[in-house]
C-alpha cells in the first residue's frame, strides 16, 4: 500500500513528479503514461519503492518492490531535482525523513 504523498522518478529525467494523494494518482495516471519508460518508479512517504507497470495500455499500476530508498539517496535525488529547477544552495538541502523531502519537492513545484 502506498503512503501518500509520493514522487515519481522517471527514467532518464532528473526532475521528480509530485503526486499528492491516491485521488490525484487516479486522476493523472493516464497522462503519466506519456512519460512512462520501463525503469520508472514511485517513492512513497515511507521511502518504499514501487515499479510502475502498464495495465491494459491505459493505466499505470504501482507494484511494490519491498525495497526502500535510503535517506541519503533520496536527498541526492531531491538535490538534483532542485538543481534542474535552478534553485540555489542545493548543497544545503537536507531533511530528516523521506516525507519531509517529498514535501520539499511539492513546495519547489508550488514556487514555479
Predicted regions and their residues:
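Short, flexible N-terminal segments of the mature chain
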Residues: 15-44
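Low-complexity intrinsically disordered segments
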Residues: 36-112
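Short, extreme N-terminal segment that most often corresponds to the first beta-strand
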Residues: 1-21
Amino acid at each position: 500500500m502506498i503512503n501518500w504523498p509520493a514522487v515519481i522518478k522517471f527514467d532518464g529525467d532528473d526532475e521528480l513528479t509530485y503526486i499528492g494523494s491516491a485521488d490525484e494518482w487516479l486522476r493523472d495516471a493516464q497522462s503519466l503514461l506519456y512519460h512512462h519508460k520501463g525503469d520508472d518508479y514511485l517513492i512513497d512517504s515511507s521511502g518504499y519503492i514501487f515499479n510502475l507497470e502498464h495495465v491494459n495500455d491505459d493505466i499505470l499500476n504501482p507494484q511494490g518492490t519491498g525495497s526502500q530508498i535510503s535517506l541519503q539517496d533520496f536527498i541526492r535525488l531531491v538535490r538534483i531535482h532542485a538543481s534542474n529547477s535552478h534553485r540555489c544552495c542545493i548543497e544545503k538541502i537536507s531533511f530528516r525523513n523521506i516525507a519531509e523531502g517529498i514535501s520539499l519537492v511539492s513546495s519547489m513545484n508550488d514556487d514555479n
